[in-house]
Amino acid sequence: MATRGRPGAKQVADHSVSDGGEQRRIPQKPPGPERCDVCSAVSAAGAAADLIDVAPLEEDLTKEPQQIVVTIMSNDPAKVCLKVDPALHYRNVELEPYRFLGRGGYGSVFYSRRANVAVKALTHGASFRWELAVSLIVSSAARRQELSDIAKHFLQIYAFSSVEKIIVMEYIRHDLRTYLDEHCKPVTQSALDALVREFRGLAKALAFFHIECGLAHLDVKQNNILVNCDPRTGDPVRMVLADFSLAAINGNSFLNKCCMVCPGRPGVTGVHIIDTEDAVNSLPSNNILLFRMSRRPPEFLLDYCNGVGPRCGEVMGAMTTFAMDVFALGSVVHEVLLLCLSRVLGRDPFPHMTCTDEPMDHKTILSLLAYRLALTDYLSQSWSSAGFVNPAGTREGISSALQWECMRDMFLASAEAWTRTVRRKMNGARSPSMFADILDLSILLCHFDPDVRRTVSALA
């Protein structure tokens, strides 16, 4: 359904009128953007103050102008200032008509048919500035020749409006969940090969995100992975990691030592995007870390069961956050593997454990660990040629890592029950050889040992 008003119009409009049954917003004069001493405010009117069209980017992004320039603060040599290209900043974004794509906890996304771009309108100023900063950092990486293979897994930023809290970015047609609903029917070898290639690329992109950028995603799931596919075959040709609403700094970050500004230009006032305190404020709360615990790695779940829960406001190491997000990516690969196997076998031979996104109690967490152990051990021993030893851990290893006897007893009982369930449900089912690579990749990404998980960044 097309949306006629600008995505951010609700933030500058105070009334609407009806025209033939259709609501048409009458925007009032928008409030001026926040002035910043670091930015040069330019008030002269300019024809380019409003975004009415988007020029396509060069295929070779290294020929595009730099989006961010790094400068040392003259009054504080220990602090860095990231200056954003003023040409990206617009007073208003006018790319109608729009088609609504989806809504999340922090804003909504629309598709501009005229410009063939995605337009994300965020609700709050703080979330807008933070997501813009993270998006610009990873988008700017595409301008470095040596990172061209990494850059394809992130969205390119075309423009933004600080008044309307809007970010204009590349449009990718599907998220992974929608792609799987519409494609891979039937499952082909070429589709599986393409999925493995793109998932490996996403793992390397996560390594760059965590280690080079000092950022953790913390919400890797099917809905946050976007897919472009070959129009003829339906095979995925590009997968992109999207939505940095929950992104946080880790121990490798430089954002807690810098600010990001966008200088002014004719018709558009300069803005202060983030400062050091914004990076510190991005540290994940306990609620975020305990959200979707089913995607958290075993070391995180074991610590939680032992009473060593996440420490709110603490900066985690880059290798710790990388292992966490890689496991979440592995969970996505595992979901894709089981879905595609079910389609090829003509039935769903796998037992499933349903988990909510809400924090779990200890009994559910221990049952989840037991389920992972039973299913992954069966798959690796019966189907995989990867040669990993105990990829999901062992009963003894997990049991010995639990401090309290009642927890150990609960886990061992769940492990025995899940092992019987897996064997009975699988009933001798065998995987076709076409699934060997995606199975091995899922085992690696979900490996019990975080050090093994992290080796994925070195994959060819």
UniProtKB/Swiss-Prot annotation:
Its EC number is 2.7.11.1. Residues 12-25 have a biased composition (Basic and acidic residues). One of its GO terms (cellular component) is viral tegument. One of its GO terms (molecular function) is ATP binding. It comes from the Viruses. The active site is at D219. This is Serine/threonine-protein kinase UL13. Belongs to the protein kinase superfamily. Ser/Thr protein kinase family. Multifunctional serine/threonine kinase that plays a role in several processes including egress of virus particles from the nucleus, modulation of the actin cytoskeleton and regulation of viral and cellular gene expression. Regulates the nuclear localization of viral envelopment factors UL34 and UL31 homologs, by phosphorylating the US3 kinase homolog, indicating a role in nuclear egress. Disrupts host nuclear lamins, including LMNA and LMNB1. Phosphorylates the viral Fc receptor composed of glycoproteins E (gE) and I (gI). Residues 95-460 form the Protein kinase domain. The lineage of its organism: Viruses, Duplodnaviria, Heunggongvirae, Peploviricota, Herviviricetes. The gene is UL13. It is an enzyme of class 2 (transferase). Residues 1-37 are annotated as: Disordered. Displays a substrate specificity similar to host CDC2. It catalyses: L-seryl-[protein] + ATP = O-phospho-L-seryl-[protein] + ADP + H(+); L-threonyl-[protein] + ATP = O-phospho-L-threonyl-[protein] + ADP + H(+).
